[in-house]
Structures are given as structure tokens and as C-alpha cells.
Amino acid sequence: MKDKFDGMPTSQQLEEELNRTRYRSRYRQVLRSTVYTLITVAAIAVLVATLVMPVLQIYGGSMSPTLTDGDIVLSIKQSEFESGDVVAFYYNNKILVKRVIALPGEWVDITPEGDVYVGKTSGDMQLLDEPYLEEKALGDCNIEFPYQVPESRVFVMGDHRSVSVDSRNTAVGCVAEEQLVGKLVFRVWPLAFFGRIN
């Protein structure tokens, strides 16, 4: 005669099956938690990259030798800029990168040889020290100097003065504060030039 418990699992088998079920449940819980954490971290990284520290790629040579075609840089959104800051700004659905030369209300004068003078009044302009330039040039210029920068705007120029189209030309003009994306602070690519942007 058959025992009525012959087809039933033993208590050890039940315990092993219970442990396997618990393990699968814990594994799914850890996996779900990890995926949620990764999604949250990715979302925060995207928000920071978009709102606080945009990552930009440089196209063209208007900022050489400081920045060259293909460089990847980090910028910081801020509202205060100084003369000498390298900034990114919106222009015709593109982002351009140039250097701040003069601030709102300041006067700018550029000689035919490319020497740049900046001052609070047209009578007290000083020669701008520009160690980042390889060569000076008047470049593509169709405004009359001396020139006073309008309020809420900055006067910008590229470091490769002979090829850069910038505030010296009415096509770009002075950049409004609301057009500014941010100050470029760090180059992340190429790795050979990894570091702060001066």
C-alpha cells in the first residue's frame, strides 16, 4: 500500500524551494533598485549638463590657438562676465564661442594693426593685454571706432582675429546678456589638452 505522502515534497525540499523563491525576489528587488538609481543619476546628469554646465563642441578656427576645431569644453552658466572670459552665446540658431573684450558702457578702439584699446570713457582707453593671441589683425570690421558697448551687451572677439566674425561686424554685433550660454571653463577633449581654459 502506498503512503499518502509519497508524492509530496519533503520539508527540506520545501525549504530549498522557499529559499530559491526568496533569492529570486531579493534579486529582482536589487535589480529594480539599481535600475531606478541609474535612471535617476542619468536624469540628474542630463539636467546638470543642460541647465548648469552645458557641454559644447568647438567648430571652426575662430578661437585658435586657445580652442581648436573638435575640442569639447564645459561651460558654466553665470550672469557676471569679465573682460578676457571665453563665452558661448546663441546666434542664428547656432552657438558661437568668443572672448569678452569689453563690458556694457565701455569704449573700444581697434587700430588698423589690430591693437585693441578699452576704457570707461573714450578719453581713458588702455591697450588691452592679450597674451592668448598669436597675431593681431583688424579683421572683418564694418563698425566705426571708437565704439561704445550698449547697455546689457558685451563686445566679443575671436582669438584668431583675421578670420573671426564677431562684434567688429554688424552681422554679429554686441552680444545681449540673454544670448549668453555661459563661460567656458574646462576642456575635456582632446585629452592631451585636458584642463582649465585661460
Residue ranges and their predicted role:
Residues 2-30, 51, 57, 65, ...:
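Soluble "head" domains of membrane/secretory-pathway proteins
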Residues 33-51:
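Hydrophobic membrane-insertion alpha-helices, especially the h-region
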